[in-house]
Amino acid sequence: LRYAEQIFQLGEQLPLAVREAASSQGVRLSVGISDGLPKPVARHLLLPATDTEGLHLLCSEGEFDDLLADLALHRLDVVLADRPAPVNPNLKVYSHALGEAALMWYASPALRALSDAAFPACLDQMPLLLPSRHAAVRARIDDWFDRKSLRPRVAGEFEDSALLATFGESGLGAFPATEWSHDELTGQRGLQLLGRCDEVVEHFYAISAERRVQHPLVQKVLGQ
């Protein structure tokens, strides 16, 4: 009798569960975000898809190579990264350039007060926080230091751009960020702009498992 009552209760609950599932259905977009990609950049790149009614956005962050493997296995709809996918005949993925953004340098007010030199010479007079060497932009930053004859003191290197900005806000060092992060850094975090570096830009890519993308939200991200 107890089992019969449980079956009856389940039968009553089933229509409600079906209705709830139906109401929660939406347009799903599963995105892999390379761990070298700054969070404000990821938000900016996904913005064209976020006005979709019923959007169900799934974002996962991970190592670039791991995300490409998941993409090839169709566990992800798209990967956002700061570099194109490497040429590999065994990996059927396709890179789409989304744009680029110049780097800008920031520091806490207290740190900025330590130097009255103009940008970029002021970078030689304060500790710096940099993206790790896993980030595609790091080599371009190092080359720029050489061209400008800068010999800065590196106080920290970070995989996570959000963590880098947090330590920068605390005054540990000056740091670079894309121009798309400017409002957040100067407004919410109260950092000061040291200067703009148009000679170093970050490039951004969407990587898909299809040459001709069929997913409507990935098409929006690509501007199609």
Question: What is the role of each PLM region?
Answer:
Residues L1-G26:
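Alpha-helical "hinge/linker" immediately C-terminal to small N-terminal DNA-binding modules
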Residues L1-Y3, V41, L45, R140-I141, ...:
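Short amphipathic alpha-helical coupling segments at ligand-binding clamshell hinges
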Residues A22-S23, K92-R133:
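Flexible hinge/capping segments at coil-to-helix
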Residues G26-V87, F158:
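Central regulatory/effector-binding core of bacterial HTH transcription factors
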Residues R28-G32, V79, L129, F175, ...:
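Short, well-ordered beta-strand segments
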Residues E63-L67, A72-R75, D82, A136-Q192:
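Hydrophobic hinge/microswitch elements
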Residues V93-M104, G187-V201:
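Short beta-strand->loop
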Residues A113-L114, Q192-Q224:
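A late-sequence structural motif
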